[in-house]
Every structure is written in structure tokens, then in C-alpha cells.
């Protein structure tokens, strides 16, 4: 072990010790009144759970907050969540890569209304990173190994997006926004109830020249959700989200014009039937995701689809025991211009027990078996627990395994530059975490920290052969460990704030050369601060700060740190009309999103200001 690695391991041990000391101090504080944590979390167990009972680290962001903060796409939403890094150049129409705990986008499972967006071609879940911020019900981030619940790719965690369920009297909002770089946005959305039918929808169109030459982007999106109560015990529903982008990508400052033209069309559809009989609830879900991608310049065309049938049973055996079990069938289809249409099926069985073992003690035990007809079988398991103390301190710990099946490109590509290997095996991972959460003043003030680690074996990597040719092999290993901490508070009714910090050490070991290097693009430190002030019932002002430190590109080349500041404001003239304004990259920070010796530096968008009007009826 090198001296540098020893120092990092020692730092990790010191921070873990400080975490334990903090818990001891906090648990000595006198208990106050009962606390309430607000929104439930579904993705951590596949059932509705209060955050105070969870033994793992998870966050939920409601659609109302996305609307209030004027996040126009998911890239901005994810930047404020601890343990998550959304790497993007901010240009309209471009995409981002979502990383959780140092794991790249292909090792983070993303889902929209139950449909997986990690496809056989685009394994990093391209759709959800640029997904529209309109008509969202909730965005959940569940960290750590989650293959026991969801199967392949859930190594670093799971990102779940849910379309809003209509509630109350029907109401509609028209949004129009103009801004820097000849940008405009038009959106119409609505939601409500009509008898036994709940409905919501949105349609939006955006265009921008963006900042660079030959860099224009266009994006259209839609969503809808319908839920209908057939009877007191049976509900059916259908939802869909679609994104259609057309983007001129300059690629990098070493790439000569013209820009590469990228067109991407993605549609996700899911439908469900849910029945309840006393203590037994069944939910049957069918989902489909279709994605088409076309790139000019270096011509690339990819077409992929995911199909899924999921049957989940939830049985409340007693007040202290809930069982969850079911089966999943999945089919992936895809092809690109290097290999013909291919498909793969997967059958899975899963089971989970949620146990209230004593006062304030909650345990979760689960297992799953996946059988891929191409990649083989894989069994995963997990266990986690939470202990709520009288001091309103929650201690928690979790351990589990996960895997990632190889995608079609790495299996079947016929290109000599990246020849597929049909003998690839799934990557395997094991992870653990320990942490605490502390609640004060009926949950108005919350703070906590988590120490985590996950190790990956049989890492699929590109292996050069001769000249510019190469293929793929299960050769290397990877390690991610670090610390997440947060403080959130509502000091007054008109002032709320959130502070989050993430430290991540992320490295891969080349087992053929016995060398270790930091994984590209992963920040060593992330700090985010969000403040929101409501001066009265009409005027809202918000300020967000994100500081990113310690990234490296391929070849261990340092990438510049950067500080992003955004502000937003809404003034409500009446129940029908509001004026909005937002500023992105307020300090006009000039920073590099990514760098390669081949294409050069990819700069991020600079200072941008937007103003708009909202009309409600």
C-alpha cells in the first residue's frame, strides 16, 4: 500500500471515529417533543416507510419543491443531494452522468414510474439525467447496494422518478420563460380529480442557442398520469413520460467544426393494477421504455427497448412483521450500427421481511435471485437496521450485495475498435454503511452523517489488443468509500436551509499492471448550501451554492474546482399570476466539465439569467 493510500485510509478511520463521537454527544441531549419527518419513502423497501424507521440512507424531493425552486430538469435537482454528483455542462439538450457514492452512471439504476432507463445500449440511464422537471410527484435517491430490490445496475444506488398523482380540484398552470442565449420555455401542466379519476399532465417546449458557437439545443417533453378507483379495493393506472432532444454538440475545444448533431427520443410507459384485501396488497405493473439515439460526425445510431412485468405482494402478518415478495420478468432489446438486433430475458424472484424487533428497533432482511439467459444467474442479499433512541437519535447500519450485467455493446459489438466479448460475466459488489440521524424541534432541525464503502470485483474494462483495436474483459476491481453529512433546518416559518457535504475516495485497480488510479470525474469533496426565504405570502427568494473539489480526468489529470451559485425568486401578484426570475452560474464561473487528450476541454455554460410569468386557473 502506498503512503498516499495509507494516509487516505487513516483519514477515513479518523472521520469514522469522529462520526461515532458525534453520536455519543448527540445521544446525551435531553429528548423533547415527538418529531415528524414528513414525506414517506418508497424506494428503500418497495413499501411506504417513514424515514425514521429506515436503516439505510435515502432522500426524497417532492415535486412541489422542484416547482418552487424552478428546477427545469433533473440535472439541477440532483446536484443538491448528498452522495450524488450530476456531471453536466448545463447546456440545453445535453445530458449528464449521475454518480452515487463514486459509482458511474452505468452502476446507478434509474427508473421512471417503474420503468428502468438503463438500457442494453445506453447503460448509464441517459433519459433520466435530462428529464423534465415538470409534473413530478417525487424524486427519490436510495444509496448503497439495492439489487435485492431491483436487480442489475443498482451498485451505487437507485434513482427513482415518479409522475405526480392528481389531487383536489382541477387546476392548471401556463409557464412562459425567456432568458440568456436566446432561450425560451413554454409549458402547460395540470392536475386534479374528476370523480374516481385522478389525473395530471404536462407538455413543454424549450430552445436555446446555448453559449458556444454551433451549440443550439431543442427539447420537447410530455407526461401524463391517470389513476382510477374501480372499487374500494382495486385501483388501476397508467403513466408516461417522453423526452425529445436535438442538440449540436461541440464535443471539445480540440474538435474542429462543425459540431456533432445528436438526436435522442425516449418514451417510458407503465400501467398497473393494485388490489387490497385486508392485510394483503398485490400490485401488478407492466412497463416499457423505448430509446432512439442518432449522432452525426462519427456516425452512431442506437435503438434500445426495455420491457418488464412485475408482480409484488405485500402482506402485513402482524403489527411487527410485514412480508414483501414477488417476481419480475424483463426483456432488453437493442442494436446499433456495430451489431444487429439482439435481445435478452431475465426472470427474478425476490423476498423481503420488514421487522419491528422492539420499541424503536426496525430490521429489514431480503434476498433476490436473477436468471439472465445471456449473463447467467446472480443471487443478492441485504440486511439493514435502525434503532431510535429516546433522545430522537436514530442509529442505522446496512450491508448488502449488488451486480451489473454487461450491456449489449460490450457483449456483441463487431467494431474492431471495441470488439464485444460474449463471455463477459456480471460485475459483483458488496457494500456497507453506518450512520446516524438526529432530530430536534419536532423535526424542524435535522442532521446526520453516514460512513460508507463498496467494493466491486470483475470490473468490465476496455483492453487494447493491437494498434487502435481493443475488446472488453472482466479484469479489474474498484473501491469507493467516504462520508456524507447534512444539516437541514426550518428556523422560522419563512426561512429554511439545507447544508450537505460529501467526501468520496474512488479508485480502480488495474490487476494486470498492479496499479491504482482514481476513477475519472468523481469529486473528492462536494459542498452544497440552499437557503430559501419567504418574505410574505407573495414573495419568495432562494439562493443555492455548490462547491466541487478534487476531480480528475482519464490519465489522472486534475480538473479545475468550481463554485456554482444560483438564485431564484417568485412574486405572486394574485392567485392567478406570478412573475419568476432565476440566475444560473451567477458568478460566471469558467470551469471544465470534462477533459480528454483526444477531444480537449469541454467548458460549462457561463452566467445566465431567465425571467418568466406563470398563469394559473
Give the positions of each predicted feature:
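N-terminal periplasmic "start-of-domain" segments of outer-membrane beta-barrel proteins
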Residues: 36-69, 97
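Extracytoplasmic beta-strand/coil segments of soluble accessory domains associated
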Residues: 79-115
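Short acidic/polar hinge/loop motifs at secondary-structure boundaries
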Residues: 97, 116-143
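Conserved C-terminal beta-signal and adjacent last beta-strands/turns
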Residues: 228-229, 519-617
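Gram-negative outer-membrane beta-barrel transporters
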Residues: 319, 323, 356-358, 363, ...
Amino acid at each position: 500500500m502506498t503512503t498516499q493510500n495509507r494516509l487516505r485510509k487513516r483519514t477515513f478511520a479518523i472521520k469514522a471515529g469522529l462520526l461515532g463521537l458525534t453520536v455519543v454527544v448527540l445521544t446525551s441531549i435531553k429528548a423533547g417533543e415527538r418529531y415528524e419527518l414528513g414525506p414517506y419513502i418508497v424506494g428503500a423497501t418497495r413499501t411506504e416507510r417513514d424515514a425514521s424507521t429506515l436503516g439505510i440512507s435515502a432522500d426524497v424531493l417532492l415535486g412541489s419543491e422542484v416547482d418552487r425552486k424552478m428546477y427545469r430538469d433533473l440535472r439541477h435537482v440532483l446536484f443538491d443531494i448528498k452522495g450524488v454528483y450530476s456531471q453536466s455542462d448545463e447546456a440545453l439538450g445535453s445530458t449528464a452522468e449521475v454518480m452515487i457514492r463514486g459509482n458511474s452512471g452505468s452502476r446507478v439504476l434509474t427508473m421512471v414510474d417503474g420503468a428502468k432507463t438503463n438500457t442494453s445500449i445506453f447503460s448509464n440511464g441517459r433519459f433520466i439525467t435530462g428529464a423534465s422537471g415538470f409534473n413530478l410527484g417525487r424524486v427519490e435517491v436510495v444509496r448503497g447496494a439495492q439489487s435485492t430490490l431491483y436487480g442489475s445496475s443498482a451498485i451505487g444506488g437507485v434513482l427513482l422518478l415518479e409522475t405526480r398523482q392528481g389531487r383536489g380540484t382541477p387546476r392548471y398552470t401556463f409557464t412562459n420563460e425567456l432568458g440568456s442565449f436566446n432561450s425560451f420555455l413554454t409549458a402547460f401542466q395540470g392536475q386534479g380529480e374528476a370523480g374516481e379519476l385522478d389525473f395530471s399532465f404536462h407538455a413543454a417546449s424549450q430552445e436555446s442557442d446555448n453559449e458556444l458557437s454551433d451549440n443550439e439545443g431543442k427539447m420537447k417533453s410530455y407526461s401524463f398520469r391517470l389513476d382510477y378507483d374501480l372499487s374500494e379495493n382495486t385501483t388501476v393506472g397508467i403513466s408516461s413520460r417522453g423526452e425529445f432532444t436535438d442538440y449540436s454538440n461541440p464535443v471539445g475545444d480540440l474538435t474542429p467544426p462543425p459540431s456533432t448533431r445528436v438526436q435522442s427520443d425516449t418514451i417510458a410507459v407503465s400501467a398497473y393494477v393494485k388490489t387490497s384485501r385486508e392485510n394483503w396488497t398485490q400490485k401488478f405493473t407492466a412497463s416499457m421504455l423505448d430509446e432512439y439515439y442518432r449522432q452525426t460526425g462519427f456516425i452512431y445510431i442506437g435503438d434500445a427497448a426495455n420491457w418488464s412485468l412485475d408482480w409484488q405482494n405485500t402482506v402485513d402478518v402482524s403489527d411487527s412483521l410485514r412480508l414483501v415478495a414477488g417476481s419480475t420478468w424483463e426483456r432488453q432489446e437493442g442494436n446499433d450500427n456495430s451489431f444487429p438486433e439482439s435481445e435478452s430475458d431475465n426472470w427474478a424472484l425476490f423476498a423481503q421481511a420488514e421487522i419491528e424487533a422492539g420499541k424503536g428497533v426496525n430490521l429489514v432482511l431480503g434476498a433476490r435471485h436473477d436468471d439472465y439467459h445471456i449473463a447467467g444467474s446472480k443471487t443478492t442479499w441485504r440486511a439493514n437496521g435502525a434503532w431510535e433512541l429516546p433522545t430522537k437519535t436514530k442509529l442505522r447500519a446496512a450491508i448488502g450485495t449488488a451486480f451489473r450485467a454487461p450491456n449489449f455493446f460490450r457483449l456483441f459489438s463487431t467494431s474492431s475498435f471495441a470488439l464485444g466479448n460474449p463471455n463477459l460475466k456480471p460485475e459483483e459488489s458488496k457494500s456497507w454503511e453506518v450512520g446516524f440521524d438526529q432530530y430536534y424541534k419536532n423535526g424542524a432541525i435535522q442532521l446526520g452523517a453516514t460512513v460508507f464503502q463498496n467494493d466491486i470485483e470483475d470490473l468490465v474494462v476496455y483492453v487494447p489488443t493491437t494498434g487502435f483495436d481493443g475488446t472488453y474483459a472482466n479484469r479489474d476491481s474498484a473501491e469507493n468509500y467516504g462520508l456524507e453529512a447534512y444539516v437541514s433546518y426550518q428556523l422560522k416559518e419563512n426561512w429554511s436551509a439545507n447544508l450537505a457535504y460529501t467526501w468520496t475516495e474512488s479508485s480502480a485497480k488495474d490487476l494486470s499492471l498492479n496499479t491504482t488510479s482514481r476513477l475519472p470525474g468523481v469529486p473528492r469533496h462536494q459542498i452544497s448550501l440552499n437557503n430559501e426565504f419567504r418574505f410574505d405570502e407573495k414573495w419568495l427568494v432562494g439562493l443555492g451554492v455548490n462547491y466541487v473539489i478534487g476531480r480528475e480526468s482519464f490519465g489522472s489529470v486534475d480538473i479545475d474546482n468550481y463554485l456554482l451559485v444560483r438564485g431564484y425568486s417568485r412574486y405572486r401578484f394574485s392567485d392567478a399570476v406570478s412573475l419568476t426570475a432565476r440566475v444560473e452560474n451567477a458568478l460566471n464561473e469558467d470551469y471544465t466539465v470534462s477533459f480528454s487528450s483526444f477531444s480537449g476541454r469541454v467548458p460549462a455554460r457561463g452566467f445566465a439569467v431567465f425571467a418568466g410569468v406563470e398563469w394559473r386557473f
